[in-house]
Amino acid sequence: MCIRDRLKPSEKSPLSAIRLGELALEAGLPPGALQILPGFGQTAGAALAAHLDVDCIAFTGSTATGKSVMQAAAQSNLKRVSLECGGKSPNIVMADFDDLDRVARTAAYAIFFNQGEMCSAGSRLLVQESIREPLLELSLIHI
């Protein structure tokens, strides 16, 4: 039996996963043990979910896509599936916080850490209206 890990990153942010593959090789992981498969979910992701030689799928993303992954897994070889679907945690920012640059910097880090693929990624900011514009300007700098 040959166990390999295949990683299909989000098509919106594949570079960190590609770099992870490079680092794995540099660290001594045998070639082919970790395969990075960039591509679109509707093609590359669907092919992985339906492939008979894939025994397990772990998916993080939308609820609609999670349902498709589960269906493809069930219709192929009834592979094990782990889903993290839906919600992302918002950050709430009130006007009495005095360091908006820190908020912008931290929010930019939080959303892109781990390619944003976790339920606590903080992909939304709920901001008191009086600080909306200055925080938006600072956020654009840090993204």
Residue ranges and their predicted role:
Residues 1-5, 141-143:
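Conserved small/polar residues in nucleotide/adenosyl-binding loops
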Residues 36-55:
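A structured beta-alpha segment of the ubiquitous adenosine-cofactor-binding alpha/beta core
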Residues 4-32:
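Conserved small-residue-rich beta-alpha loop and adjacent elements
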Residues 8-10, 38, 60, 94-95:
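Short beta->alpha connector loops at strand-helix junctions that form conserved
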Residues 28, 50-51, 56, 63-141:
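ALDH superfamily catalytic-core signature
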Residues 13-16, 40, 131, 135:
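Hydrophobic/aromatic residues within well-ordered alpha-helical segments
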Residues 12-15, 42-43, 64-65, 98:
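Short alpha-helical
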